[in-house]
């Protein structure tokens, strides 16, 4: 979380907003139903309030289309910095481009948005994938495995899967396990 705030500060600094007070930061959540985002939101709000800045947000509720409208709404409410947890890395691009034209810094939070000038902050997804694979292998070291990767529109699914594969390959070479399925989950939702 601290890194997110450091990147937000860097974005503000690079746009000349560093000395401004009462900067409005808009946060676009892809799916606020996950408990993690509520924890992160509390930390972001607290830091912004401490700095004398304003927090506004919108929840896309799992809809890439709604997220585009949400970002328009955040911009119309005066957001001078955007933090975006993208529902779909490609569908979000029109909103990111609109913000860029308005010289609004965009921070891709947790999910990569491949667009010029977008800051990206996340944890080490590959290492998390390795950790997941180690835990699964410890619990069930032999047998048939099905790999469920998450949404194909979330780049983290591939990063996690890459880390898992590094660990699983070694066990597979010993003949202890076999991958019998490897699928994305379209529209992956927390419920």
Locations of regions flagged by a protein language model:
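A residue-level marker of the well-folded mature domains of exported/periplasmic proteins
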Residues: 18-191
